[in-house]
Amino acid sequence: MFHRIGQFVVKRAWWVIVAWLIAAVAISVTAPKLASSDDESDFLPRHYESIVASDLQQQAFPEAFTPSAMLLFQRTDGGQLTADDKAAMTKVTDGLTAEHIQYVQTIVPVNDKSISKDGKYALSLIGYDKNAPQSNTDTTKKLRDDAKTLAGGTDLKVQLGGQAATNLDQQDSSSTADALIFLGSFVLIVVILAFIFRSAIISILPLLLIMAVIMPTSNALIADATKLFGLKANSTMSAILIVVLLGVGTDYFLFLMFRYRERLRAGEPRKQAMVSAIGRVGEAIASAAGAVTVAFAVLILSSLGLFKAIGPALAIAVVTTAIASITLVPAVLSVIPEKALFWPGKKWRVEKPGARFAALGRMTQRRPGLVAAVSGGFLILLTLCSLGYKGTFDLASGSMPKTKESMVVQNTVMSAFSAGASDPSQVYVTSTNGSPLDKSTFPAYTAALGGVKGVSEVAPQPLLSKDGMTADFSVTLKDDPASNAAIATMDGLRSTAHSAAPAGTKALVGGQTAVEADINAAMDHDYKTVFPIAAVLIMVILGLLLRSVVAPWYLMASVGLGFGATLGATSVVFQKFDHQSGLMFMLPIFIYLFVVAIGTDYNILMIARLREEAREGRSPREAAYEAIKHGGPTVASAGSILAASFATFMLAGNVLFSEIGFSIAFGIALSAFVMAMFFTPALTALLGRMAWWPGHQEPEPVAPGQWTERDELVAARYRK
């Protein structure tokens, strides 16, 4: 099939190029704008308790004041606030109120209750119109700028924090991160390609095709799918898409380019060489893309909206890239003369001895048992380190630098006031018998909630709805609302809230900590559902590719070890050496996405080469030698580019991207340089022909570089 695709693409190269350009423009112009959300509650299904509580709050207390932002006041000299300072703070809040800033509904003046115990800090809470669009940042920018202007000429320093300010800072941080990641990936890919091929055109061509055609097409299709299926996008998605498109697109380009150069060196005419390259590597690209796409698409089964959106989005990006890699890319390459393509290199036709990879192949050929034991033992050792993994749920502080103003405010509020005061939990008690709540039961219920371990205080008077059917008990926790300790408190708080609820009522616990506790539960569900389904589907794809029921098992086992080893190494680096309390809760999913899914690419490329060598009549150990000798440079180059691309995440300057960057770069390196280069060939050599059971049938031996009769017939068409 791929030979026929190659013939069509090469014969009608200009038609293929024009068709791609027209399709890219048409799809991009008609696509909707992709809006994103960073509100964690947006990513939970509606049946979780925290979401049900939020819905109840909106119904029972439609006029309730919910602060969207907060002004933090302090003296510039760090001293205690004076009477003059309090007057200046009133001037600031009154001035902002008088401006009637769009969507600002309420600005609460500073009072005695909003001043810290040490007298150095004061808070003014700000409420937005509930109908204000979440994507609106102009209101928050104006509030921040005008507050600083009004505080000018005083001894006060004023900063804006809260959810609205966090959203603004996350957006700014995300834009900066995207630019740094794109620039870093671009430069690294150009340098690595230039080093590999010594060619001006090859070093820049894949990036031009990705940026000009593949990326706009993918982004437009993702926007269409997101709107069509009502999915939620996240600011993290854009940075990940950049790296996936650049990294995976360049990887598939390398898969094709190495084979194309190999066939040219074997003496095939230019156009026939491209047909042969597509025919030989097309199946590997399609299978690799299929495995990655399935792994990504399975995330549609996730409980979390974040992964429901990012999985299909990445699947669309990979499918688009794979289709372009076997149509657009070969069409462009086939119209470029060989001298121009490889300029200024002059010795590209001469195959280098490849002594390093030949030596590695020879080592595996001679001692496959030792190679399998050492590489497998290394993976197992790192996997054991994953037992120390701990998750943390403070997504806001993890997704941007701690120097951002909203983060400074958050940390100051937690230290100057009660740690949980920045975002109290809410316990809603609502009548189930149609009668108004009995207020006489409130004191006992308040006392029961206050007795829960981890609770700092409970507001003495709950807020009662107008119809008297629902009461809101505000509960301040002892710990930071986003901390693991606060999330652990949720179990006890929910248990007490439910069991101590007065007769004829039911209780629901809401608030940010409750949302994060539910996210934790949803993640546990996803680990038990998504991972096994993805593993089974990837094994099916591997079985279809290899016509074997044996090889998929040890290939998936090696990928599983790669996942565990990556998580273990990341846990050691960030928890042990960087002294972090835990890794971001979503990190295991990201490791799964890229190490399991994309890491399978390199295993597929190597196992496909092993099968090809075996079909040419070589013994299992000889096949391992030839596969590493010829496939090793491709795997090493592709792995280096993708690992380097993900390493650029660490340029973003925030905890989440640093963890993602390190873990995925390390995992990709493991996949390429340990699993695909040593573990998989060594195991295949040890298993021998049993690895291909029952589908392997050995044809007549074909010497390396020898054309088959089919190749000769196809080549005749291009010798005019």
Predicted regions mapped to residue ranges:
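Membrane-proximal amphipathic alpha-helices
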Residues: 42-43
